[in-house]
Amino acid sequence: MRFVDEYRGEPEAQALFSALRRDTHHAWNLMEVCGGQTHTLMRSGIDRMLPEAIGLIHGPGCPVCVTPLEQIDRALAIARRPEVIFTSFGDMLRVPGSTTDLLAVKSAGGDVRMVYSPLDAVKLARENPDREVVFFAVGFETTAPPNAMAVWQAKRLGLPNFSILT
């Protein structure tokens, strides 16, 4: 299975929209939460093909989509510094800045590492006292508690080489 081409055929799409029109008996509001989802819905015309009873609400966007370009460029500049271990969740590694992304900085020799938790970055700071460890703390309310815990833990452990970029 290719998982792309088989969903792009017009007859198949029309059959799905016919089924939606037939089976939609009350109003629905759907929120897309990522700018990429919104872009795809609009570009493909799905928003215009939905039954009138189905409304789309444009949500807040995911952190990857709404992080300002200037913030990504700041992250790239920090990640290039030889004294820095720059850490981030994996989804931010491919997000382009003005000229490049974090994976390209890593390929060029920058010490960029993917972590699964801000506490992984704290652990790196503890293991590398001679390097500044920076965690790229993008996100919303759901990521604030673990970020705060990482700052608290670094302070509790006396790690002056840990910081976050928000």
Describe these PLM feature segments.
Residues M1-D130, A144, A148-P160, L165:
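Metallocofactor- and cofactor-centric catalytic cores in central/energy metabolism, strongly enriched
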Residues F135:
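Nuclease catalytic cores that cleave nucleic-acid phosphodiester bonds
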